[in-house]
């Protein structure tokens, strides 16, 4: 069979397969890119998971107890203790954290 004969016979199938491959690649890139949206915060001296919950739970739309449970599970904290200098992943999307940390200054001030 020549290429022209194959194309004439199966062009709909070939276009369908190519479209599926392109859409699959786009979907995979989207899913892979969205996996790292959670924020990572530096633990300061005297901080605890509950202190982080006080500070960030409202931004994550979670109750404080749920926030603490999520942080312990995702960061493999069996005893629930963190020490200064540790980095902890919290269930707050980076965009929410950046938006709330920035300040807006009025032009006349």
UniProtKB/Swiss-Prot annotation:
Gene3D superfamilies: LysM domain (3.10.350.10). The keyword Transcription regulation does not apply. PROSITE patterns: LYSM. GO terms for cellular component: cytoplasm. One of its GO terms (biological process) is DNA repair. It is found in: Cytoplasm. Residues 39-90 form the LysM domain. InterPro entries: Cell_div_suppressor_YneA, LysM_dom, LysM_dom_sf. Keywords: Cell cycle, Cell division, Cytoplasm, DNA damage, DNA repair, Septation, SOS response. The keyword DNA damage applies. Transmembrane segments: none annotated. HAMAP family: YneA (MF_02014). Belongs to the YneA family. Inhibits cell division during the SOS response. Affects a later stage of the cell division protein assembly, after the assembly of the Z ring, by probably suppressing recruitment of FtsL and/or DivIC to the division machinery. This is Cell division suppressor protein YneA. It comes from Listeria innocua serovar 6a (strain ATCC BAA-680 / CLIP 11262).
């Amino acid at each position: 069979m020549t290429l022209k004969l194959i194309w004439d016979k199966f062009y709909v199938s070939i276009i369908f397969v190519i479209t599926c491959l392109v859409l699959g690649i786009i979907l995979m890139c989207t899913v892979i890119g969205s996996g790292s949206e959670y924020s990572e915060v530096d633990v300061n001296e005297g901080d605890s998971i509950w202190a982080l919950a006080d500070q960030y739970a409202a931004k994550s739309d979670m109750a404080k107890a749920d926030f603490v449970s999520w942080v312990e599970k995702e960061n493999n904290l069996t005893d629930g203790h963190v020490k200064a200098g540790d980095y902890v992943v919290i269930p707050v999307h980076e965009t929410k954290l950046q938006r709330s940390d920035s300040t807006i200054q009025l032009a006349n001030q």
